[in-house]
Amino acid sequence: MSILLAQSDEGGVSVAEFENMFWLFAVAGNETLRNGLPGACIALLEHPPAQAELRADPALLPVAADEMLRWWTPVMTFRRTAMEDCEVGGQPIRSGQKVVVSFASANRDETVFAAPDRFDIRRRPNPHLVFGHGPHFCLGAHLARVQMRALFAEVLARTSALTPAGRPSYLRSNFQRGVKRLPIAWTA
């Protein structure tokens, strides 16, 4: 925090902007990966052919990691405040109104994704919104992708099979899609 506070910006950073940046660094950057990793495990448990394909060809992991995140969508919604009057999808929105952005819905949009409910580890392009978009794009997106690829590269290289060992227990939330408990069995 002291490094952030010591920085200067030509226009200055308001207290609200600083608090928002702190929240994004401390909390938001954690959610995608913390909830994305077990969601990716569930994707592979529910799709054994994809698991076998990734184990046979780890070079697919960069594309597969994005698909795992799109398919699971760890942060489902985010609220934004309109800064000016506008219209979205024919709906007028006044400056100051709160708008909920549904990443979960956007990541299953049939006008963007062919067969959006299908888990496809070869999906290209994959313009998912797991990390947001535009000025709110997640600063930790690259790190999260690297960590996902590293984890699954090791897990898949060290096992010959991952299978469910019980029913998962899910986090109940309108904001994040998470897993409290995920029993997994593996064969070395």
Language-model segments: residues:
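Cytochrome P450
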Residues: 1-188
